Amino acid sequence: MDAYGRLGLPSLFLAPSLGGLVASYIWRTLKPTIGITCLNTLWMTLLALLGGAFVFHEGVICLAIVSPLFFISVLAGALFGRILFKTYPTRLRLSLLPLLLLGVLSEPLTRDAGESVITDEILIHAPAAKVWSQLTSFPEIPAPPRFWLFRFGLPYPVATASAGDFVNAERQCIFSHGAIFKERVVELVPLAKLTFEIVESPQDPELVGHLTPHRGQFVLHDNSDGTTTLIGSTWYTLHVRPLWYFNFWTQHIFRSVHLRVMEDIRRRAEISEPH
């Protein structure tokens, strides 16, 4: 997906669909059945994934995420072509291809590279002061990752280091496999809010060119009953399309990152709180 993001090539739905349509035109004299068309589409998908791995150096997680969409897109184009090249005159068929190609190539011009945010919250049975002391930096998270993509190899948070509790303090959010997000504190309200900008992301193949994380934030709400609501947010921009598909995965991943960190904060805050 990195190459698609950097070069601004068409959506990973439209481009494979066009590929499937062209393939069905090439296959038309063979008159393949629907089953053979599906099998041929599977081979096309596997070849595309191998190309992504060896030519564009895409990560395994990225390829796993994109593979269902790629297969369905190629298959949709191939099945549409199977009907088109059976039913309509040759001249009409060929006149449609330039129009479809124009639509695919012009699709990137319609994109809005807007910023998105994902927010999660948990309840902690400890006062805000106890939670805050565990928030600004923390040691290695002892719990093994639960999210299946983390276990499959996607980098996950393991610790955070901070230069101090003040604005402009440098932070490091340390992920597995040596991935480090460098951050800078831009807003700090003791016992209430911590906001930091992400100034440098790791050059991980699962991340580069796919999305840009901009900033993160923790907000503490004192519930006046000895408990605290911890709210974690991340702002980001996606560089791959279709947005609805990749945003689904991105939000799912960010939510798993948030909850892994916040659940460890809760564990440490509640342990330090006498019962």
What is each of the regions a protein language model found here?
Residues M1-L30, I34-L39, F70-F71, L94, ...:
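Glycine-rich portal/gate segments that line the openings of hydrophobic small-molecule binding cavities
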Residues A23-K31, G51-G52, F56, I61, ...:
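Membrane-water interface at transmembrane helix exits
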Residues M1-L9, L14-L21, I26, L30, ...:
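Hydrophobic ligand-binding cavity/cleft-lining segments
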Residues S67-P89, R93, Y236-H275:
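A conserved amphipathic terminal alpha-helix motif
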Residues P127, H177-G178, P190-L191, N223-T227:
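Short strand-connecting beta-turns/loops that link adjacent beta-strands
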Residues I34-L39, W43, L47-G52, H57-E58, ...:
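Beta-strand/loop substructures that line and gate deep hydrophobic ligand-binding cavities in soluble
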Residues E121, R184, Q217-V219:
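Short, surface-exposed charged micro-motifs
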